[in-house]
A protein has these predicted regions:
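Short glycine/acidic-enriched loop and turn motifs that connect beta-strands
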Residues: 6-9, 53-57, 103-106, 152-156, ...
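A short loop-to-beta-strand structural motif that recurs across blades of beta-propeller domains
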Residues: 12-13, 60-62, 106-109, 163-166
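Surface-exposed loop and turn segments in beta-propeller and other repeat-based domains
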Residues: 26-32, 73-82, 120-131, 174-193
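Blade-loop segments of beta-propeller domains
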Residues: 27-90
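Repeated scaffold domains used in trafficking and secretory/extracellular systems
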Residues: 33-44, 83-90, 130-138, 185-199
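Asp-box/WD-like beta-propeller blade repeats and closely related beta-sheet repeat scaffolds
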Residues: 75-94, 100-108, 112-140
């Protein structure tokens, strides 16, 4: 990535390397990706490229795979709403995946094979009085989708020291539980543009990064 002087925009690229040895590389085999987000690789072999987080590129989600020659092959495109600020993707299976739309307070379910929208899961009823709710990084465990919730005001700052998650049933795509912790003095459950900011260990215990002060 190359950041512009004001810090809110720039150019980012991704490319596939045949090994991890030192070398000299250029962008001749690279693809442009959205600035402010990172490509998301899944266990299925899919690599998703999100649009620019601040809305400076076409609002579309692209799915790629790598062929035997190490070239990127586009497998499909899903058009996203304007000002979505898409930030994270998890796959349930070959027929359902989820993308969190921070700017709209929505988690969108879509078919990763056909790249067609299935449903919108609106989480705006979970917002605090002083903030808007912004779904962030996600993880699936035992048929439930756990979504980190960033409650932020117009300055991207929290109003309360709450850790909050939404638990969604992946069969119905309905909200089952709003999980709130007010005792740890932390906030912002997960970092939205970091898919590794929520993870699960061998015992299926879920861990998440939060912000404190």
């Amino acid at each position: 990535s190359v950041t512009n002087p004001e810090g809110n925009s720039g150019a980012s690229y991704m490319q596939a390397l045949t090994d991890l040895l030192p070398g000299t590389y250029d962008n001749s085999n690279a693809l442009p990706v959205g600035f402010g987000t990172k490509p998301i690789a899944t266990a299925s072999g899919n690599v998703y490229v999100l649009p620019d987080y601040m809305g400076n590129t076409k609002p579309e989600l692209n799915r790629y795979q790598i062929d035997a020659a190490g070239k990127w092959i586009k497998k499909g495109t899903l058009l996203l709403p304007a000002n979505a600020a898409a930030c994270n993707i998890v796959e349930l299976n070959s027929e359902k995946a989820y993308v969190s739309l921070q700017g709209l307070g929505i988690v969108m379910a879509f078919n990763p094979t056909t790249m067609k929208k299935l449903a919108d899961i609106d989480l705006n009823d979970l917002k605090q009085t002083e903030t808007r709710v912004s779904p962030a990084a996600m993880i699936v465990r035992d048929g439930k989708l756990f979504v980190g919730l960033n409650q932020m005001n117009a300055q991207y700052m929290p109003a309360r020291n709450n850790i909050e998650l939404a638990m969604i049933d992946t069969k119905t795509d309905k909200l089952e539980k709003h999980i709130v912790n007010t005792t740890l003095g932390m906030c912002f459950a997960t970092r939205p543009i970091d898919p590794q900011s929520i993870f699960m260990d061998e015992q299926k215990d879920i861990y998440l990064n939060c912000i404190g002060s």
